[in-house]
Amino acid sequence: METSLHRTLKAHYAADESQIEVRVSSFRIDAIDDLGRLVEVQHAGLGAIRSKVMKLLENHSVRVVKPIVANKWIHTLDVKSLKVVRKRRSPKRSNHLDVFASLLHFTQVFPHQKLTLEVPLLDIVETRVPEKKRRVRAKQYRVLDQTIISIHDDLIFQDIDDLWRMISMQPTFDPRSSLQQSTTKRGKAKLETPLVFDTSILAQWLDRPRWFAQQVAYVLFRCGVTSEVGKLGNSKLYQVDKRLTALHSRSDGAAA
């Protein structure tokens, strides 16, 4: 069943009402935007639409919208009256970095010259009703709907430059901690020096657990942001494409 969240995003990105739920060849498309691009909104994993998008890209420009829920408020309803009996804010927080989890199963498609990946952050209300637990690990509730409160901080990814830019813009990103930089003399490190890292260093740059950094490292490698340059113990070493390192160096200097 389609959620209010999905309906709202289709209307948000469509050129007008007539461009929602459009038939293109053998596919039903969520929307067509004002530039004529086919829009696919995918709240679930991107792997589910991988084959569809690959086929559409043969003849069309495609805009994939992958929303990330930054903040969620949970409203629990009474089963009989369907009135709200409890409200709380979910402790879980997400940001743009979480798109890497979906890209794990989308690297066969992205990047592509006719593909735009758009990642808006959402604040939403999720409406639930209690459910009897039928299995040991089954959820104790059923989600009735998800409604958008606000859409903000829309990031657009069109090529590998955009992926690396997101990494390098993290507050905890410090190129001096790369393996290549750490071997230079103190105070002599330059951003032009190739950035070599393992997933432990990447986890520090992202301020995330190492298991998450491993997912990011895989995506960066598969998309062509990095290449494997050896191992340190059991850890793979990755080097950032020199063109991207230079790009970061120029933008960093301009900001200064």
List the predicted regions and their residue ranges.
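A short, conserved structural fragment
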Residues: F221-K231
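Conserved catalytic cores of phosphodiester-cleaving nucleases, focusing on short active-site segments
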Residues: I29-G45, I49, L56, R63-V64
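Short amphipathic alpha-helical interaction segments
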Residues: R208-F221
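Long, low-complexity, charged/polar intrinsically disordered regions in eukaryotic proteins
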Residues: V85-W164
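Short acidic, hydrophobic short linear motifs in intrinsically disordered regions
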Residues: S178, E192-L206
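Acidic-basic catalytic patches of nuclease active cores, encompassing PD-(D/E)XK
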Residues: M1-R28, K83, K92-H96, L104-H105
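Positively charged, polyanion-binding regions of nucleic-acid-associated proteins
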Residues: Q158-E192
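Short, cationic-aromatic polyanion-contact patches
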Residues: K231-A256
